[in-house]
Amino acid sequence: MIYGTGIDLTELSRIEAILAKGLRLPEKILTPAELAVFSRYPVKRQIEFMAGRFSAKEAYSKAYGTGIGAAVGFQDIEILDNAQGKPEVTRHPFDGPAWISISHTDTLVMTQVILERGNL
């Protein structure tokens, strides 16, 4: 059964501007494992990765029903690629499966998260 679904859309230019200012967004949004992946990428891919993870965590919080805040924070959610390169929610506070899709264009990233409980 679907518990919740969340969708988010983030402009890459917004993330690029924040990163260009030298603000500590990656440390706030990304877990240590995500930061390790982020740091290996060239700048253009860092922007895409950061925007994707930010958007995905926002979408997750919407599916969870709380938004980002006291109940669930950015560090509570971890999204890493599996061996085939598919993003997976590897750590999160919900007690059921979390399904994720991340899609990029030249200017935007769109994410969807579905939280499942029990059998469909």
Curated annotation (Swiss-Prot):
InterPro entries linked: 4-PPantetheinyl_Trfase_dom, 4-PPantetheinyl_Trfase_dom_sf, ACPS, Ppantetheine-prot_Trfase_dom
The protein's required cofactors: Mg(2+)
Catalytic activity: apo-[ACP] + CoA = holo-[ACP] + adenosine 3',5'-bisphosphate + H(+)
Assigned EC number: 2.7.8.7
Top class in the EC scheme: transferase
Pfam families listed in its UniProt record: ACPS
Keyword annotations from UniProtKB, A to Z: Cytoplasm, Fatty acid biosynthesis, Fatty acid metabolism, Lipid biosynthesis, Lipid metabolism, Magnesium, Metal-binding, Transferase
GO biological process, one term: fatty acid biosynthetic process
Function summary: Transfers the 4'-phosphopantetheine moiety from coenzyme A to a Ser of acyl-carrier-protein.
NCBIfam families, alphabetized: acpS, pantethn_trn
Protein's name according to its UniProt entry: Holo-[acyl-carrier-protein] synthase
Organism whose genome encodes this protein: Lactiplantibacillus plantarum (strain ATCC BAA-793 / NCIMB 8826 / WCFS1)
Gene: acpS
